[in-house]
Amino acid sequence: MDISRWLERHVGVQLLRLHDAIYRGTNGRIGHRIPGAPPSLLLHTTGAKTSQPRTTSLTYARDGDAYLIVASKGGDPRSPGWYHNLKANPDVEINVGPKRFGVTAKPVQPHDPDYARLWQIVNENNANRYTNYQSRTSRPIPVVVLTRR
């Protein structure tokens, strides 16, 4: 394992957990924008198996009025839990900073004609990390379009 991958796993994950706790704990007042990082939103879903409320912070990009998130899980072979949750119930809520509102989630897969354009937007927004994540897995990484209801 190279040093950048080790740092990502052992330092980066801890920083992400801290950021997530602060962002959720302040209901979006702190954590929306961090210098040098893409903006984050809070995604509120209902557990597909448990029916329990779930919240996670994710970086996002914009495409017009839509918010774009990526189900990368850092290139893990499995999709993140939140992705399964929104597939089961696509009507979810997000916080962008302290503003919370309803959105409808639409996963976009590589076979979709708009995928390449959306992938370019999110990948450039996140310093080309998603290309690196995709190289770690054979699973196609979907882009999720969140449209305000």
Curated annotation (Swiss-Prot):
Its EC number is 1.1.98.-. It catalyses: oxidized coenzyme F420-(gamma-L-Glu)(n) + a quinol + H(+) = reduced coenzyme F420-(gamma-L-Glu)(n) + a quinone. Pfam families: F420H2_quin_red. One of its GO terms (molecular function) is oxidoreductase activity. Disulfide bonds: none annotated. The keyword Membrane applies. InterPro entries: F420H2_quin_Rdtase, Split_barrel_FMN-bd. GO terms for cellular component: peptidoglycan-based cell wall; plasma membrane. The keyword DNA repair does not apply. It is a peripheral membrane protein. It is found in: Cell membrane. Coenzyme F420-(gamma-Glu)n binds at residues 48-50, 54-59, 70-73, 81-85, 130. Keywords: Cell membrane, Membrane, Oxidoreductase. Involved in a F420-dependent anti-oxidant mechanism that protects M.tuberculosis against oxidative stress and bactericidal agents. Catalyzes the F420H(2)-dependent two-electron reduction of quinones to dihydroquinones, thereby preventing the formation of cytotoxic semiquinones obtained by the one-electron reduction pathway. PANTHER family: F420H(2)-DEPENDENT QUINONE REDUCTASE RV1261C (PTHR39428:SF1). Belongs to the F420H(2)-dependent quinone reductase family. This is F420H(2)-dependent quinone reductase Rv1261c.
